[in-house]
């Protein structure tokens, strides 16, 4: 019976001493991994920031370009007076001097091309 107790006590002491050493090693490993994780997080954050900036630049570029499908705003329709220097006629219309009718009003009107 004493042999069992001594064996048990010996195994217990070894487990506690080795467990304590493993605990210190684990703590050091966790600190190293945490430091590495921070550097990885910084790298990932910078990469994400670059991608977001590229995406923002693309979106702003697309907004600045005029789409073919976009509707013209504040354009002048056919037969409406326009300014010779700043014609705002709708697409398919040109600002021209009128022939016969309308010559007594303004000097230029929007007409079909």
UniProtKB/Swiss-Prot annotation:
Residues 1-21 form the signal peptide. Probable ion channel inhibitor. GO terms for cellular component: extracellular region. Residues 22-74 form a propeptide. Keywords: Disulfide bond, Ion channel impairing toxin, Knottin, Secreted, Signal, Toxin. This is U11-theraphotoxin-Hhn1a. The presence of a 'disulfide through disulfide knot' structurally defines this protein as a knottin. Belongs to the neurotoxin 14 (magi-1) family. 01 (HNTX-16) subfamily. It is found in: Secreted. The keyword Cell division does not apply. Coiled coil: none annotated. Disulfide bonds join 75-90, 82-95, 89-110. Expressed by the venom gland. Residues 61-82 are annotated as: Disordered. It holds the Pfam family Toxin_22. One of its GO terms (molecular function) is toxin activity.
């Amino acid at each position: 019976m004493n042999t069992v107790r001594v064996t048990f006590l010996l195994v217990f002491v070894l487990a506690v001493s080795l467990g304590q050493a493993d605990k210190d090693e684990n703590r050091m490993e966790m600190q190293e991994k945490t430091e590495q994780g921070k550097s990885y997080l910084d790298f990932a954050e910078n990469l994400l920031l670059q991608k977001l900036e590229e995406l923002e630049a693309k979106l702003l570029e697309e907004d600045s370009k005029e789409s073919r499908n976009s509707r013209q705003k504040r354009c002048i329709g056919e037969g409406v007076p326009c300014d010779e220097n700043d014609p705002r006629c709708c697409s398919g219309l040109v600002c021209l001097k009128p022939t016969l009718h309308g010559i007594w009003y303004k000097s230029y009107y929007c007409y079909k091309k």
